[in-house]
Amino acid sequence: NKYYKTNEVTWVDEAQMFKIIDRAETIEPLMIGSKAPNLVLRDTSNFIHNLYAINKDLTMLIFYDPDCGHCKEVVSDVKQNYDEWLNNGISIEVIAICVELDRDKWIEFINNYDTGDWINVAEFKTYVDGEFNRQNDPYVTPFPYVKQIYDINGTPKIYLLDKDKNILVNSIKGNIGVDQLSEIVENESKE
C-alpha cells in the first residue's frame, strides 16, 4: 500500500492504482492481529448484542447466507465442533450473522441447523422500503456498513477473535477448513 500511495509504482495506470489502494484500505483493518470492528445487531427476539461486550476467551463470527450451500455445510460442521468445544471447557461464543434480509429464511436456517445456542443476529428493523433509516433504530450498526467494514463480498466468511477481539483468523469461502479452524480454537484455548 505504501508504494502505491507514494507513486513509487509506475507500471500501473491511475484507474488500477485507485482500485489497488481502495482494496488495501478496505482489508487493512481486517488483518490478523487487528482489533475487529465492533458490531451491534439484534437477535431473533429483538435483543441487541454488542460484540465488544462478549466476555469469552474466543469469539467466532460467521457471516452466512441461508441459501448458500457451502454456508450450510460450514455452519453444520462448526456446530458439531462447537458442541465438542463446550464439552471440553473451551470458552467460546459463536455469533452467526445472516446477510440475507429475509427474516423467514433466517429463522428457518437457525431451526434447521440447530444454532439456537449461538448468538444469531441480522438487521431488518432499520430498513424502510429498502433504505436504512437511522431514526428507526439508532442503536444498531447499519447492515450495509457491517458488510462493508467486514468485507463481506461472499459467504461463508469466518473470523476468529481472541478475548480482546483481535483477529486470529480471517477466512473467506472456506479457505481454512473447519478441521483447521477447530485446531486453532483448541490451541488458542490452551494459551
Question: Language-model segments: which ranges?
Answer:
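Short active-site neighborhood of thiol/selenol oxidoreductases, capturing the structured segment around
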Residues: 47-78, 93-95
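Loop/turn elements at helix/coil->beta-strand transitions in domains of secreted/extracellular proteins
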Residues: 56-58, 90-92, 115-118, 163
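Oxidative protein folding and maturation machinery
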Residues: 1-49
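Structural microenvironment flanking redox-active thiols in thiol-disulfide oxidoreductases
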Residues: 73-116, 127-131, 140-145
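Thiol/disulfide oxidoreductase modules built on the thioredoxin-like
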Residues: 128-186
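Extended hydrophobic-aromatic, low-complexity segments
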Residues: 50-51, 61, 69-74, 103-107, ...
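Short, small/polar residue-rich loop motifs at catalytic or cofactor-binding pockets
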Residues: 35, 57, 153-155
